[in-house]
């Protein structure tokens, strides 16, 4: 993924856990209560890592926060209207990082540091914290986590004090479940013709957990039991996982895509909304395969086959 002006060394690798959260946000929101919370924790801030923080890492500023990702050194929090993103310091208390309203790909805008720190329009909806500002960086317990996670509600990123860091002995922190409307619009955008199929899709909705939700459950269960390496270890193996893109009814969105890697868009393909099977004849490309065109033809073929069987 693009690094938005941040070096590709340790700082970039340290942010991998948050990139994973960005990718998982739609999945977590759709998983519902069927699974336990998916948990992620950063490696401990050792004495050596703390000693490596230079005095310049404590500049005079209104609020100190931890470095992006799993960093241990204190940095100045970004203030209101300042630029922010995945690889930048967190926004100050009470602020969140939002992409530009006109951004075509909000998560990508945040990865590239093109967000802006702003106050949430509705603090009740997003759960903005009313707790005191973030700590000054003195407490570096073993279980400090990457607090600045990205979700896909238009690419919002939590502010500095939206969560308290977990203290020694507390090994887990649940990933916040929030609405994921924008990501679903981006991933499920297949043109007007697709929306004409919504009624027929609803009428054929399976009862209980749908195939898409079941596949999603399996992926989340696998991730929740993974032993994630620390920030020095690559997490490329996570990109081999396909996280299914389910719609609000639990059906597969016509367009399914792999995650972007090293700034290159992942491949996208078209599937049947009920069973998730690849639609024959539809392309697999790094872009929009215009699945609604192929689904229309696929649906007509199914109806024709059903009519023949009924005769």
Swiss-Prot record:
Q: Name one GO cellular component term.
A: extracellular space
GO MF, any single term: insulin-like growth factor I binding
The answer to keyword Signal applying to this record is yes
Ranges for the IGFBP N-terminal domain? 38-120
Cite the SMART domains for this sequence: IB, TY
Per the annotation, which location comes first and is thus the protein's main one? Answer: secreted
Q: Name one Pfam family in it.
A: Thyroglobulin_1
Q: Where is this motif: Cell attachment site?
A: 286-288
Q: Where in the cell is it found?
A: Secreted
Q: Where is the signal peptide?
A: 1-36
Locate the Thyroglobulin type-1 domain: which residues? 209-291
What residue spans carry the region label Disordered?
112-168, 188-210
Is Lipid metabolism among the key words of this record? no
Q: What is known of its domains?
A: The C-terminus is required for IGF-binding and growth inhibition.
* Protein function: Inhibits IGF-mediated growth and developmental rates. IGF-binding proteins prolong the half-life of the IGFs and have been shown to either inhibit or stimulate the growth promoting effects of the IGFs on cell culture. They alter the interaction of IGFs with their cell surface receptors.
What does the record note on quaternary structure? Answer: Binds IGF2 more than IGF1.
What's the protein name? Insulin-like growth factor-binding protein 2
Which species is the source of this protein?
Gallus gallus
């Amino acid at each position: 993924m693009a690094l938005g002006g941040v070096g590709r060394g340790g700082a970039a690798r340290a942010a991998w856990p948050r990139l994973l959260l960005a990718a998982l946000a739609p999945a977590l929101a759709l998983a519902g209560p069927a699974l336990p919370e998916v948990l992620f924790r950063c490696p401990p801030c050792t004495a050596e890592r703390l000693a490596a923080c230079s005095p310049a890492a404590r500049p005079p500023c209104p609020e100190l926060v931890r470095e992006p990702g799993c960093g241990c050194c204190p940095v100045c929090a970004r203030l209101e209207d300042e630029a922010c993103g995945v690889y930048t310091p967190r926004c100050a208390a009470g602020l969140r990082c939002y992409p530009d309203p006109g951004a075509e790909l909000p998560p990508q805008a945040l990865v590239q540091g093109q967000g802006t720190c702003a106050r949430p329009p509705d603090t009740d909806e997003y759960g903005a914290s009313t707790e005191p500002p973030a700590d000054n960086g003195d407490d570096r317990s073993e279980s400090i986590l990457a607090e600045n996670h990205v979700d896909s509600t238009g690419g919002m990123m939590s502010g500095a004090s939206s969560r308290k860091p977990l203290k020694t002995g507390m090994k887990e922190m649940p990933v916040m479940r929030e609405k994921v409307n924008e990501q679903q619009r981006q991933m499920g955008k297949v043109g007007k013709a697709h929306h004409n199929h919504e009624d027929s899709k609803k009428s054929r909705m399976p009862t209980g957990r749908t195939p898409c939700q079941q596949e999603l459950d399996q992926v989340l269960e696998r991730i929740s039991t993974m032993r994630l390496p620390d920030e020095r270890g690559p997490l490329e193996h996570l990109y081999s996982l396909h996280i299914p893109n389910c719609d609000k009814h639990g059906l597969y969105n016509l367009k399914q895509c792999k995650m972007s890697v090293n700034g290159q868009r992942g491949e996208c393909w078209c599937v049947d909304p009920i069973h998730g099977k690849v639609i024959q004849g539809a392309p697999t490309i790094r872009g929009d395969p215009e699945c609604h065109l192929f689904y229309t033809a696929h649906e007509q073929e199914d109806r024709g086959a059903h009519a023949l069987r009924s005769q």
